[in-house]
């Protein structure tokens, strides 16, 4: 006779074992209709799950975050069901949930077309409308392998074959379609009402370019139609803001086939870069960091000692010379340990903070490259703090405050914090990971921050705090990180002399605020739709003469602004002033200064803001003071 405790603290008693669906029905007909799954002891289960003992139970509906993930997961299966009905020869592989949706990979003899996607989506809607029950079945592993091989589903059979033979596997059936899955799933296809297929892209089996190429169909699914509409509107807005298009339009950078994943910065784009690097260099200096510079290429043996070779070699570029093997650095941390090791260190020097604008290279798959957002060569505002274990909390707390300040200066005030915990592939003993994870939690508590935890998402050498900024159209971008590492310093021989005159191994904190500068610039371009705030704008002020008679004065004003430290240009073309104003307005320049005969005679400029506001005439010195105040405040221009 199980007693079921509900989230409101009430307890319901039942005379016999009861399913999650039956509990929901006993509470109310509305909840029974809305139930998608249950949550028992923190674990999600199907509504058909039989509760035989006392338990704490929450009924999951579309209002819960877990409910939306269930909808997306189940819609991925619905997609596979529809594809198999329309294209029986297609083989199914995997179909996980991703941010804002899902995808499913298929092996098929020809590319899926846009017309195919329309047909597949239509069939999905038909299957959903049929209200087909979704049920869980438990099979012996070998029986499941044989079943899928008999169906000609070699990929699914391979996945199941990798499971230990003595383990059972769970399969989910809906109508004539059956798929491998841990679950849970929605109880019926009728729960899947709001979805849209987005695109087809290439993928490789198991993510390895040496394997067969597959076709990946992406989709999105939501609980309500208005949520889908809002998401599609956001995508339209994101397309308008695409940094690749704006980068070309505003002459900031380009990329080309001869250097995949590498950036050619144009003068205007490099001006943005230099401004950001200068700002972050001041952040280093003002917060006790010593800037260092380490080699691009290091002997393979060092990467073996650090653990990178074992856990990261597939993402590393390598080269050989004079019978020695080298790797181009994908990360800066081993180099910073070498700087630490170059002298005898004392506990009195700790915490010792190193910062570097470290140029790194990672061999990302060609299909994953995406403008500035995913590159093969990038620079990080990277830093490493060598400290004692009892200094971790204060260092993490100080860093958390610094991150908040930096993001605010760039216009990002909505920051979510996540704690990524130990992955399956890692270095170090579990007790070391326990200490590292607890140290980060303590630092977050001391900062008064709320966070969510991400099991299995940490780096191979340590857990990490992730800082996710939200942009102007609601997208979340993970930028900053703080990681505690008890392993790498010892692996690379880092030591200091403690207060008791014994040699001790320091703790190493890996930290970055912006992350990849390339990616952060891409985020900035899209966040501001190219209209960067004054302090970041590649051209801050343009001076426009009305006629040839004011050309010398316009050039003089531009030079005065330039001498005051501003990125200023003079547009002296023999064009109508309305044409020049319109052109520079389209280029989203923060300020336009118009000079005619009156302005020249009185030593003034007529000032227009990016938003079209007319600030009237003013002396150049007054304008310079205004601009200086705006730059110091890091505020945007209307």
From Swiss-Prot:
Protein name: Threonine--tRNA ligase
PANTHER family, per database record: THREONINE--TRNA LIGASE, CHLOROPLASTIC_MITOCHONDRIAL 2, THREONINE-TRNA LIGASE
Domain of life: Bacteria
GO annotation terms (biological process): threonyl-tRNA aminoacylation
SUPFAM superfamilies documented for this protein: Class II aaRS ABD-related, Class II aaRS and biotin synthetases, TGS-like, ThrRS/AlaRS common domain
GO cellular component assignments: cytosol
Record-linked InterPro entries: aa-tRNA-synt_IIb, aa-tRNA-synth_II, aa-tRNA-synth_II/BPL/LPL, Anticodon-bd, Anticodon-bd_dom_sf, Beta-grasp_dom_sf, TGS, TGS-like
Similarity comment: family membership: Belongs to the class-II aminoacyl-tRNA synthetase family.
Enzyme nomenclature, EC number: 6.1.1.3
PROSITE patterns xref list: AA_TRNA_LIGASE_II, TGS
Record's cofactor remark: Binds 1 zinc ion per subunit.
Residue runs in coiled coils: none
Subcellular location: Cytoplasm
GO molecular function: ATP binding; metal ion binding; threonine-tRNA ligase activity; tRNA binding
Swiss-Prot/TrEMBL keywords: Aminoacyl-tRNA synthetase, ATP-binding, Cytoplasm, Ligase, Metal-binding, Nucleotide-binding, Protein biosynthesis, RNA-binding, tRNA-binding, Zinc
Annotated binding of Zn(2+), by residue: 333, 384, 510
Subunit structure: Homodimer.
Residue ranges of domain TGS in the record: 1-61
Catalytic reaction list: tRNA(Thr) + L-threonine + ATP = L-threonyl-tRNA(Thr) + AMP + diphosphate + H(+)
